[in-house]
Amino acid sequence: MMEEYTFSSAQETVLPLGVKVVSIKMDEGGLIPESMDELLSNWDEAARGARKPFVLYTIPTGQNPTGATQSAARRKAIYQVAQKHNVFIVEDEPYYFLQMQPYTGADSSAVPPPANHGEFIKSLIPSYLSIDVDGRVLRLESFSKVLTPGSRVGWVVGSEQIIERFIRNCEVASQNPGGISQIVIYKLLDEHWGHTGYLDWLINLRLSYTDRRNSMVRACEQHLPKEIASWIAPAAGMFVSP
């Protein structure tokens, strides 16, 4: 299962492998849990010619391409549907740390930035991994959207059994990210910035993306005719979807 609008490369990766993909409806808040539950509850293997779906691929934060961000309440609701139907969740979160300040309108005062690291961390929407009690979540993360786009370095977090299988697959597929990219990021994060420096960078990135988002939305408000166009100010990520 995937959102009805999703990252094209994710589809292009799994379809040649014979994976059957079904889409789940979305709204401005992302994937709709009721739509997912209805699909799974009424699944007819004979009519569909396929077994009941058992994996959900989702981009919860700053979704590509819609820009939608699932709220904490929605993530809990989707996780409960996954528990009900024994579905494994692949949580793709390259934009997780691009969560922005709330959009208050073109003529309103900006929301003050986080005062410290603790306030910044507290402001982040809980991930699926953080609410996982069954070991049914694999979280994908990346430095490509928040640090060095050309590094192509990321990491995965999940249960020991899943990670072991992931490692075995990597040994005969991609093997490892580029060694130069790994050492550059290691030197930056471990020897130069440290945890506090990285958090400072992420806070600065939030403010920068908030300014960019606000400029884009203001331009939409000023120049696009509301009779034929509509948009929602994204809470995270790189996309504004009409």
Which positions does each model-derived feature cover?
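Conserved core of the PLP fold type I
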Residues: M1-N86, V90, Y96-I131, Y209, ...
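Conserved core segment of the aminotransferase class I/II
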Residues: P16, K20, P126-L207
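Acidic catalytic patch
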Residues: W43, D92, S181-I185
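Short coil/turn segments at secondary-structure boundaries
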Residues: Q70, P102, R152-V153, N169, ...
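A structural signal for well-ordered alpha-helical segments within the folded catalytic domains
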Residues: K76, E160, G179-I183, T210-N214, ...
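Structured helix-beta-strand junction loops
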Residues: K84-H85, D134, N169, R212, ...
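Conserved glycine-rich beta-strand-loop-beta hairpin in the small C-terminal domain of fold type I
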Residues: L202-V217, E221, I228-P242
